């Protein structure tokens, strides 16, 4: 019987439970945020401005390795293209075996590059909130408002107000339903964006399959090597599909904060940023690790010359081979 769906569920739960999948990266970022904030603030957590500055400097330090990160991330596609060229050129099995080994290494380097990108983005999460508060200060100044009336009866000048003053002024607390609603919406946005992009890949792949079938039907001699396929048409479908299908997800990332701000105000937008950052960070690590593991498992199965069909527990066997490796 077909156990592919069950195997996929098992694999998702497996990689979600592995400590090295999400726990260690999240703990590393948490420790980095706390240490950078603590050291830059002079061991005083009340010094928010200097603590945020320390987090920003820590993110810049992490991004200083961008050159090496980009080089390692670009290694994977190069090795993959080399393997494709070797296969289409009809080279020997030894060449293909070596390119497959390089491609597997490329998956590891790509995962490393993704980890740096995800970690640096999460590290600047608190600085992102601070920059939004600074934009609020600029907006209030443009509107002509010069005084903030805090709930405790104290009035503070807009230019001299601290981060905490703005939180008190807009009642940014977990007991505020606007903040909580924004956090739920932000958490939803991460999963919605991933779902839209994955569906886009499926639709583009379906169009590509239809084009390949059309060429098989209409262009005689492709299967026998007597005629050349229309490669340009396939490239055109993938390029147009990639651009067209990303329009709505991109607009969603722009419209969601604006719509949330119009409905829930500043507390809702801050909650949206917090929810999107926290859920998106963990989701990004999980999907990157699970995808890389599946890819390497598939290569391990192919290397053992295992035929995947509807009656074969493909994914569970692939993960088993990966664990044995």
Protein language model features and the residues they cover:
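Short, well-ordered junction/capping motifs at the entry into regular secondary structure
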Residues: 1-8
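Short "domain-exit" segments at the C-terminal end of structured domains
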Residues: 308-325
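Short intrinsically disordered, low-complexity segments
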Residues: 8-10, 15, 320-322
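Intrinsically disordered, low-complexity polyampholyte segments enriched for Lys and acidic residues
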Residues: 2, 304, 323-325
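Hydrophobic packing and interface segments
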Residues: 4, 13-307, 316
């Amino acid at each position: 019987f077909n156990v592919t769906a069950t195997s996929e569920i098992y694999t998702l739960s497996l990689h979600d439970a592995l400590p090295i999948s999400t726990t260690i990266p999240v703990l590393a970022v948490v420790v980095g945020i706390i240490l950078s904030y603590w050291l830059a603030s002079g061991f005083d957590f009340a010094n928010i401005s200097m603590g945020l500055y320390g987090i920003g400097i820590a993110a810049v330090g992490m991004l200083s390795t961008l050159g090496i990160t980009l080089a390692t991330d670009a290694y994977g596609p190069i090795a993959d293209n080399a393997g494709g060229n070797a296969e289409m050129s009809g080279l020997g099995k030894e060449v293909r075996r070596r390119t497959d080994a390089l491609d597997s290494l490329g998956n590891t380097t790509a995962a490393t590059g993704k980890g740096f990108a995800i970690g640096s983005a999460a590290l600047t999460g608190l600085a992102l909130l601070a920059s939004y508060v600074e934009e609020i200060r600029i907006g209030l100044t443009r509107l002509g408002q010069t005084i903030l009336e805090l709930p405790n009866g104290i009035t503070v000048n807009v230019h001299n107000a601290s981060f905490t003053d703005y939180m008190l002024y807009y009642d940014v607390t977990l007991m505020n339903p606007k903040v909580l609603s924004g956090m739920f919406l932000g958490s939803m946005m991460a999963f919605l964006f991933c779902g839209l992009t994955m569906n886009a890949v499926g639709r583009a792949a379906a169009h590509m399959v239809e084009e390949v079938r059309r060429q098989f039907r209409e262009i005689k001699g492709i299967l026998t090597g007597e005629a050349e396929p229309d490669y340009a048409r396939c490239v055109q479908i993938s390029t147009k599909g990639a651009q067209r299908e990303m329009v709505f997800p991109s607009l969603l990332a722009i419209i969601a904060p604006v719509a949330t701000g119009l409905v829930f105000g500043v507390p809702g937008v801050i909650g949206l940023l917090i929810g999107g950052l926290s859920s998106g960070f963990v989701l990004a690590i999980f999907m990157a690790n699970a995808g890389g593991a599946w890819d390497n498992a598939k290569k391990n199965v192919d290397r053992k010359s295992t035929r995947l069909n509807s009656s074969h527990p493909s994914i569970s066997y692939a993960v088993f081979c990966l664990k044995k490796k």
